[in-house]
Regions:
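Hydrophobic, well-ordered secondary-structure segments
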Residues: 126-133, 137, 153
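Short, conserved secondary-structure transition motifs
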Residues: 102-103, 122-124, 145-169
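Signature for HUH/AEP ssDNA processing cores
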Residues: 1-114, 118-131
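A common structural junction motif
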Residues: 88-92, 134-144
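Epigenetic mark-reader domains in eukaryotic nuclear proteins
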Residues: 14, 169-170
Length: 170
């Protein structure tokens, strides 16, 4: 299985929702690259001045989506990476358990939670980038529907582990 190349930008911090500066460009060529980078708060787009905002969006070659399993309290309804693979057969993507993977959150039972990274051809229009996320949500409505804008960041995960799933991307 060939892993895909994509670019993310990291901050110098972890779990800082107020941060908007992502100065470190990281080219992801394998799971080890992503595991190291995902230890820090990060974005999957380039922004003018390295400052995250919708208006500063410049380019992205990765579509990040969250699989939080917030759609149901019934464990039998929770979705797994196998469900993602079945919905997008042959599509390669990276998966990193989120910082709240298998932990109680907001009084709700522990459940599988993942950050998924789909490498894409470069996109330079924020509206098109959002439409791509909306398309993915239409195909798999279990992704977090609040994470569609072009300025979405992902919290870093201490001890992040990454997997390449689903297939080959040439």
């Amino acid at each position: 299985m060939n892993e895909a190349i994509m670019t993310i930008y990291t901050a110098d911090c972890r779990e800082n929702a107020m941060n908007t500066l992502y100065p470190r460009k990281v080219t992801i060529t394998c799971t080890d690259d992503l595991a190291k980078a995902a230890a820090y708060d990060h974005v999957c787009a380039e922004y003018a001045g390295n400052r995250r905002s919708n208006s500063a969006f410049r380019c992205a070659d990765c579509l990040p989506l969250d699989l939080d399993n917030s759609h149901s309290e019934n464990p039998a309804d929770w979705k797994t990476l196998d469900d993602v693979n079945a919905t997008f057969p042959g599509v390669g993507y990276y998966a990193v358990p989120s910082r709240n993977h298998m932990k109680e959150k907001d009084g709700k039972a522990a459940r599988p939670r993942y950050h998924l990274y789909f490498p894409i051809d470069p996109v330079t229009d924020a509206a098109e980038y959002r439409r791509m996320k909306e398309y993915m949500l239409a195909m798999f409505p279990y992704f977090d529907d609040k994470a569609k804008d072009a300025a979405r960041f992902l919290f870093g995960v201490k001890g992040a582990q990454a997997e390449f799933m689903g297939g080959d991307i040439e």
